[in-house]
């Protein structure tokens, strides 16, 4: 019992001497997460009929994540949940935006895009596009027909 009481007393003394304003304490209690205002990108999805859906996503999320996380009403979009097996997250980019995308499509994505309706030279799968801060204000077009390549 004496040992327990002396441990408690030592703990209290250590807590009293802890300076919560010290850099070490600040780092210890910091989450390490970026501020929301710095890691959010505004995006507009344009339906084939011209209707615009404005939403936002976190830097590092895919365009598929943005649709799912914000409950964007795009019927059938992302049926395979980003496993590169369906082409339902087919999106069409403006040429200027397409050229700025950091990664070029891989063979698997190109194979899926071959099965997509309304394919263009600036088509990509939303599950393969990762948001970055320089995509702020991005506007992407959703084809009028969504094709699930798994049904082919």
Curated annotation (Swiss-Prot):
Primary subcellular site in the record, as a coarse category: mitochondrion
Keyword Metal-binding listed: yes
Gene3D superfamilies: 3.10.20.30
Disulfide bonding pattern of the chain: none
One Pfam family it belongs to: Fer2
Location of the protein in the cell: Mitochondrion
GO molecular function, one term: metal ion binding
Binding site for [2Fe-2S] cluster: 80, 86, 89, 127
Example GO biological process: electron transport chain
Deletion phenotype: RNAi-mediated knockdown results in larval growth defects, strong larval lethality and strong reduction of ecdysteroid peak level required to proceed to pupal stage. RNAi-mediated knockdown in the prothoracic gland results in larval growth defects and lethality at the third larval stage, with a complete lack of pupariation.
Needed cofactors: [2Fe-2S] cluster
Keywords, in A-Z order: 2Fe-2S, Electron transport, Iron, Iron-sulfur, Lipid metabolism, Metal-binding, Mitochondrion, Steroid metabolism, Steroidogenesis, Transit peptide, Transport
GO annotations of cellular component type: mitochondrial matrix; mitochondrion
Residue stretches making up the 2Fe-2S ferredoxin-type domain: 41-146
InterPro entries assigned: 2Fe-2S_ferredoxin-like_sf, 2Fe-2S_ferredoxin-type, Adrenodoxin-like, Adrenodoxin_Fe-S_BS, Beta-grasp_dom_sf
The record's free-text note on cofactor binding: Binds 1 [2Fe-2S] cluster.
Transit peptide: 1-29
Role noted for this protein: Required for ecdysteroidogenesis in the prothoracic gland which is necessary for larval to pupal transition.
Family: Belongs to the adrenodoxin/putidaredoxin family.
Name assigned to this protein: Adrenodoxin-like protein 2, mitochondrial
Source organism of the structure: Drosophila melanogaster
Gene that this polypeptide is encoded by: Fdx2
């Amino acid at each position: 019992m004496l040992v327990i009481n002396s441990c408690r007393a030592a703990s209290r003394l250590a807590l009293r001497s802890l300076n919560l304003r010290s850099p070490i304490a600040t780092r210890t209690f910091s989450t390490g997460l970026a501020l929301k205002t710095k890691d959010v990108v505004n995006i507009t999805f344009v339906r084939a009929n011209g209707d615009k859906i404005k939403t936002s996503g976190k830097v590092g999320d895919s365009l598929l994540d943005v649709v799912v996380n914000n409950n964007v009403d795009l019927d059938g979009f992302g049926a395979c949940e980003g496993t590169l097996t369906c082409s339902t997250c087919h999106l069409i980019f403006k040429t200027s935006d397409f050229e700025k995308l950091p990664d070029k499509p891989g063979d698997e994505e190109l194979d899926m895009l071959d099965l997509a309706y309304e394919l263009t030279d600036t088509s990509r799968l939303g599950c393969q596009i990762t948001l970055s801060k320089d995509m702020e204000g991005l506007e992407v077009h959703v084809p009028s027909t969504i094709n699930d390549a798994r049904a082919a």
